[in-house]
Amino acid sequence: MKTLLKSLKITLAFCVFFSVFYILILWLFAQVAGPNKGNAEVATLEGKVVGAANVGQMFTKDIYFWGRPSSAGDGYDATSSAGSNKGPTNQEYLDEVKARIDTFLVHHPYLDRADVPAEMVTASASGLDPNITPRCAYVQVKRVAQARGLTEEQVRAIVDKSIEKPFLGLLGTEKVNVLKLNIALEESNK
């Protein structure tokens, strides 16, 4: 009985610690050291909020760069954030990827099937990834330039300016935030 009581006390102490104090400590750390104080990075265009730069959004028009597909509900639903849990041997998953490749090629007829970046047809683990690699952005330059009536060089220059380097030059890889890139495109068209 003594052991059971000790175990219950320890369990209760850990429950309180991890459900209250641990979360509070992380929140305080984010408020002090985190980017944007641990809050969403709100993106604006012409003074209007157009989204959060740290959550992916669906772009389907040819005048915009596209992000990765989302497995989070219909169109980047943050309440459904999760991976699809479908593996490369799942026929339904393979059919989805094939359909995404076909759609991508319809909008990028200058590409060969083998040149479609895998990341543009597969969802990220959260289904809400706001970033793509520079390669994925460069693959879309021609389509976006044609749709906007700009030269490829103009659009490529905007992509070049939008590339974010790895944290401290070491952690992670180069990336392009799709929402920020599309905002930069809109601002350049003025």
Mark where each language-model region is.
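Short, Lys/Arg-enriched, disordered terminal segments
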Residues: 1-4, 189-190
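Aromatic-residue-lined binding/catalytic grooves and analogous aromatic/hydrophobic interfacial grooves
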Residues: 3-18
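Flexible, solvent-exposed loop/hinge segments and secondary-structure transition points
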Residues: 6, 19, 26-147, 163-166
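Extracytoplasmic/periplasmic C-terminal soluble domains
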Residues: 139-190
